[in-house]
Regions:
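Non-catalytic, peripheral interaction segments enriched in hydrophobic/basic residues
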Residues: 45-46, 53, 77-97, 101, ...
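Hydrophobic alpha-helical membrane-association signature
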Residues: 24-28, 64-68, 137, 144, ...
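Catalytic palm subdomain of template-directed nucleic-acid polymerases
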Residues: 13, 50-77, 95, 129
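Short, conserved non-catalytic motifs in the polymerase core
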Residues: 1-24, 52-58, 127, 152-159
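Active-site palm subdomain of RNA-directed nucleic acid polymerases
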Residues: 22-53
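Helix/loop segments that flank and initiate small ligand/metal-binding modules
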Residues: 255-265
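Secondary-structure capping and boundary motifs in well-ordered enzyme cores
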Residues: 12-21, 38-41, 64, 109-112, ...
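Short, conserved micro-motifs composed of acidic
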Residues: 2-6, 67-70, 82-115
Length: 265
């Protein structure tokens, strides 16, 4: 096999939306993830970059954070990639010893320390309770349910099975997004109540029931398991996806486990 190599100098950027663009970006951006700094993990999606810095002391955390930011900024400058400083934020995910801010800088610009940070659709808070995220997805799902309900009146609307597919499908896609990350949040009564309340709004519209009907009764009427069990089910499917290909049979198995748990209560 004859192999010929050719080097070309590129003098223009790749048009936005091109097929080749993402692949070329991944090739270039991969160098950032090869930076080796102890206690620092790189997480990236497209052009979003997250740096997770860990250390035994707060001062060491600051030192490592500034070191990695300096290295990333140097790489971006050399590769003519612009860093959006106005969009760059820092958050302290702490234990019992609380610190409100961390002193990290890029060049001469201090990075703002925030109490909540949204990354890839998930809201992280300092105490890692995920309560702000639960409130956020509950609000989004509630708005979606309200808008869809205007299109589907209780009378002269679609059949119940169609309502279930549409309303529960939309609501659950929002409520169960990225569940493996925040699944432990469902352990608190507060977060559980927020999710169950949002689910109840959807089930009221699915069943065309009176507002006085309880959430537990609506779940039985519509054959929809409690949100707490749906969170556990989705997380279990994700765990199985790490070692096997997810099929309809596997989803059916997990749903059967959910129903057994529900009926055993």
């Amino acid at each position: 096999i004859n192999i010929h190599n050719m080097t070309l100098k590129i003098s223009a950027g790749v048009p936005q939306g091109s097929v080749l663009g993402p692949h070329l970006w991944n090739i270039i951006y991969d160098e950032v993830f090869r930076l080796k700094i102890p206690g620092v993990n790189f997480i990236g999606f497209a052009d979003d970059l997250s740096l997770v810095v860990t250390a035994d002391s707060f001062s060491e955390t600051e030192r490592r954070a500034n070191e990695v930011l300096k290295a990333v900024d140097k790489w971006m400058t050399e590769n003519k990639v612009e860093l959006a400083l106005q969009k760059t934020e820092a958050i302290i995910l702490h234990g019992p010893r609380k610190r409100e801010r961390i002193n990290v800088k890029i060049r001469d610009t201090e990075i703002q320390t925030v109490k909540q940070l949204k990354y890839l659709g998930i809201i992280f808070d300092q105490n890692i309770t995920f309560t702000p995220h639960v409130k956020y997805i509950a609000s989004r799902a509630g708005d979606a349910i309200a808008k869809l309900s205007r299109l589907m009146p209780n009378t002269r609307g679609p059949y119940t099975n169609i309502r279930r597919q549409i309303l529960n499908g939309v609501a659950n896609s929002i409520l169960l997004y990225a569940v493996p990350v925040w699944k432990k949040a469902i352990r608190t009564a507060r977060n559980k109540a927020i999710l169950e309340s949002t689910q109840r709004k959807s089930l009221l519209r699915v069943s065309s029931a009176y507002r006085t009907v309880s959430g537990a009764a609506l779940q039985v009427l519509t054959a929809e398991p409690p949100m707490e069990l749906l969170v556990t089910e989705r997380a279990a499917i994700h765990e199985r996806a790490k070692v096997e290909v997810i099929t309809r049979e596997i989803r059916a198995e997990e749903r059967e486990k959910t129903m057994d748990t529900w009926q055993g209560r």
